[in-house]
């Protein structure tokens, strides 16, 4: 398999690189323990009730308040690794996760933390999110398809991570040794990052996972089993049919492809997938085992014909995904995998030859939250907002009107929600995501806001972010006050102009 990423593609990059360019980092409180006086970047927050909340972030920082955010104490986490996620099951029990397989557990309300061992310890994968389902049950997600479950308070963890099978699209790209592992039934983990897991506050048996490449999952048993969700773009095109041994497309097909490309031109999170097909007769006559190159040339020509129309319509090549491309170097695999060519031919077989053109969902997703068992929201890179009305089975896009990365969201209902993100983004909607705006009670900031969470009941909540920024609301998010830092003219200066689009 490809070399592991030292920091998972984009998520960790946004957590690590962006803050470094904006300020000097300090990791220890001035004067030792006690009230915070220095700015650790904060990535996540968990709110137990109107009094108790915990925030976590850079260099092993875990901060705790038990007076509704008036004062905060830096607790002993026993690590200097970055902590990306934190979740409390109740006032006493919770977990925090982070860099290099870090899993911490508390049983005293976050005052002290103990390291827990998982099956990922020797793999060094980054853990990006944790959801405490109960004092004994929790779910963790991270890079390389990491999906862990404990039902005994973290004494043991079940590894339910995403793996590759022989019919998985990534199988053909594995190294030969990894392919052999798959055939033997050994686990080879999928090269995908899962960024967030969350469960419904009122019933934590209903949970959801999201990640890169539009990976979506839902569970109705507290994370013991998962089912895939899907994004419905509403943009489709009929397959481009071609005759036997033909590569040219008709004027009508050209117009249809052009209209299809124009429909997604401004939606940068959508790519176009091109997948050529061949008939049984073509495979038999042109794809002979001792010389499959004539068939490869037909397949390649069909792909190029359609791709040229898409590019002429204004779609850059980096947004075009070529699936089922001819394996020109197939001879390198035959000795170790005698069925390689047969599998490829079977994957191209269709009744009517031609090319399938489809939407390839490619949003990089950061956070998922549900207001109830049906109404859910997802945020992502480039201002992506997704909505579900059926418990996460299907999702559709909503228009935020901004292009910043949206790191967090809190829904109060199916109509009302608040999102936070980079460059001080704090927006709200009261019409189910049809329109978004900066409400009158929102502060004007220029720092990165990472996470948002509210206490059960929804009145008291916090936003956390860069340089130990902590905002507090007591009125369901309508108005916010700065809890930490007490003053910072760089971060709190009023904007002279609207924030950059």
Regions found by a protein language model. Name each.
Residues 11-19:
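Bacterial N-terminal signal peptides
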Residues 232-268, 276-297, 351:
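Short, solvent-exposed beta-strand/turn patches at coil↔beta or beta↔helix junctions
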Residues 260, 266-270, 282-289, 301-363, ...:
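Periplasmic OmpA/Pal-like peptidoglycan-binding modules at the C-termini of bacterial envelope proteins
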Residues 22-235, 255, 259, 266, ...:
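Residue-level hotspots at or immediately adjacent to binding/recognition sites across diverse folds
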Residues 2-11:
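Bacterial N-terminal signal peptides that target proteins for export
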Residues 79, 253, 295-303, 402:
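Short, conserved glycine- and acidic-residue-centered signature motifs
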Residues 100, 277-279, 325-327:
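Solvent-exposed coil/turn segments that connect beta secondary-structure elements
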